[in-house]
UniProtKB/Swiss-Prot annotation:
Residues of the Orange domain: 136-171
Ranges where the bHLH domain occurs: 59-114
Compartment(s) of residence: Nucleus
Known role: Transcriptional repressor which binds preferentially to the canonical E box sequence 5'-CACGCG-3'.
Record organism: Danio rerio
GO molecular function, one term: protein dimerization activity
Entries under SMART domains matching the protein: HLH (SM00353)
Record InterPro entries: bHLH_dom, HES_HEY, HLH_DNA-bd_sf, Orange_dom
GO CC annotation, single: nucleus
CDD domains the UniProt entry points to: bHLH-O_HELT
Name listed for the protein in its UniProt record: Hairy and enhancer of split-related protein helt
Stored PROSITE patterns: BHLH, ORANGE
Gene3D superfamilies xref list: 6.10.250.980, Helix-loop-helix DNA-binding domain (4.10.280.10)
Length: 270
């Protein structure tokens, strides 16, 4: 129903009906007033027009800007997933934020290595499990490092605090009893040894960011407290290599050593 239908010409009426309707209209105008009568009629017309505009707006296609934003969001989401999936990109996460072009290049190199004739196929389940456990433990220790940094710098907890020791002991017990990688859990440092390795360093007000140490040793510096958490070198344990060393040597030879450098010149300033 639109405004034109409201003002449709009425059918012809008799003189008696016309007089009766005129009397009713007069009584309505006397009760509401002429201004209110006009406002009520126009308000009804206005509501009908707004309803038709809303229906037309719903039929309007999505703007080009919205489509472009959705497309960029999908691209960025997929690139983030690639950065967490490709081993070479995962190993370089600590050296700084990777550019989109770098992630795509590493993905192409990784796929070429997978499809190359030199790359071994049909690897043993135990070998794959060992490699996956390598990345699992490396990521777990990275999370523990960040948690210890948070507890000592933000929560102001002392290393001799009972709650602090219980948290680290709980995390260590979880990584040892992991059902998937439980057979490799013995390579993780003992909770007691881990607590003994926590020590204070001299305060350094100018350094307030994490610094990556050589493989097998993680440390960070803070403006308040600077505990150092040193894990046993991963390469010292049989079947448990560092993330870069754990990659298959055929993959390394195919891509090249420079692609795996964790201290690339592009990220030296970070």
């Amino acid at each position: 129903m639109n405004a034109r239908a409201l003002y449709k010409r009425p059918p012809p009426v008799s003189s008696s009906q016309s007089e009766a309707s005129g009397k009713r209209r007069t009584r309505t105008l006397d009760a509401l007033g002429f201004d209110n009568y006009i406002i009520c009629n126009y308000r009804l017309v206005f509501y009908e027009m707004m309803a038709s505009k809303m229906k037309d707006r719903k039929k309007t296609p999505v703007s080009h800007k919205v489509i472009e934003k959705r497309r960029r969001d999908r691209i960025n989401r997929c690139l983030n997933e690639l950065g967490k999936t490709v081993p070479m990109a995962l190993a370089k996460q600590n050296s700084g934020k990777l550019e989109k072009a770098e992630i795509l290049e590493m993905t192409v190199q990784y796929l070429r290595a997978l499809h190359s004739a030199d790359f071994p196929r049909g690897r043993e389940k135990g070998e794959l499990l060992t490699e996956f456990a390598n990345y699992f433990h490396y990521g777990y220790h990275e999370c523990m490092k960040n948690l210890v940094h948070y507890l000592t710098t933000v929560e102001r907890m002392e290393t001799k605090d009972t709650k602090y020791a219980r948290i680290l002991a709980f995390l260590q017990s979880k990584v040892v009893t992991e059902p998937v990688f439980g057979s490799l859990g013995t390579i993780s440092p003992d909770p007691t040894d881990l607590l003994c390795q926590l020590e204070y360093q001299s305060p350094s007000p100018t350094e307030s960011v994490f610094q990556q140490s050589p493989p097998g040793h993680f440390s960070w510096h803070s403006s308040t407290r600077s505990p150092t958490l040193a894990y046993p070198a991963m390469s010292q344990h049989s079947g448990y290599l560092s993330p870069v060393q754990g990659l298959d040597h055929h993959y390394m030879n195919f891509i090249g050593h420079n692609a795996f450098s964790l201290h690339n010149a592009q990220h030296a300033a970070l």
